[in-house]
């Protein structure tokens, strides 16, 4: 597919690196473990473990949840909007998804679409190539383990009162998730909750306690 998710300039580049012994046989994020195992068999080496990942958008500010500062009519390019449009976009939240679909255009697998103003990933078809991650000027998209138990769907670093003015479902940094987590896996950093997946046991208490229901 030549998506470049492996870090090389296309499939040929990765293949050459594998043959030269400078890249792992399981280096293709799209092919995943099955392809890695086949290449390993051909090369006569161990495939090693491959953790399946999926793209995740850290924003829940849909059209009915996020406020707008003005109506925007212009080019659908998130980078140009972030760089040139007043306030970095029309949404009240300066950290939210711009909804213009640069990630959609970048995805070679048709796995991401803008729904109600926010990019949404289909985890069943996402190949974790990372193209959408590179395409987002707000740095809202990251690759997470496919079996991640709980995630925070917000990226705002504004204080709670400012978040409430901009989005009805934004993290307000109330610390309820942090205070109630029995595994010390959740912490509020820069006014937004973060979950340490190494410590998270999937108990779901943080999601239950979140008043904004942005922990999924």
Named regions from a protein language model:
Residues 119, 192-193:
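Hydrophobic residues embedded in beta-strands of well-ordered beta-sheets
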Residues 1-180, 184-187, 207-209, 213-216:
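Ferredoxin-type iron-sulfur electron-transfer modules and their immediate structural context
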């Amino acid at each position: 597919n030549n998506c470049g998710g492996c870090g090389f300039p296309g499939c040929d580049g990765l293949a050459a690196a594998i043959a030269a012994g400078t890249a792992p046989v399981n280096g293709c994020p799209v092919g995943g473990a099955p392809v890695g195992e086949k290449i390993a068999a051909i090369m006569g080496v161990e495939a090693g473990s491959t953790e399946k990942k999926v793209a995740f958008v850290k924003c829940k500010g849909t059209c009915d949840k996020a406020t707008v500062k003005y109506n925007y009519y212009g080019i659908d390019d998130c980078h140009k909007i972030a760089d040139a449009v007043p306030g970095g976009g029309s949404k009240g939240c300066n950290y939210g998804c711009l909804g213009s679909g640069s990630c959609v255009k970048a995805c070679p697998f048709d796995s991401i679409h803008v729904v109600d103003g926010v990019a949404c990933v289909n985890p069943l078809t996402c190949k974790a190539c990372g193209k959408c991650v590179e395409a987002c000027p707000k740095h809202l998209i990251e690759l997470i383990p496919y079996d991640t138990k709980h995630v925070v769907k917000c990226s705002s670093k504004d204080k709670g009162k400012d978040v409430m003015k901009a989005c009805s479902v934004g993290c307000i940094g109330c610390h309820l998730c942090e205070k109630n987590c029995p595994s010390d896996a959740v912490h509020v950093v820069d006014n937004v909750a973060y979950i340490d997946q190494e410590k998270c046991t999937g108990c779901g208490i943080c999601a239950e306690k979140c008043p904004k229901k942005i922990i999924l």
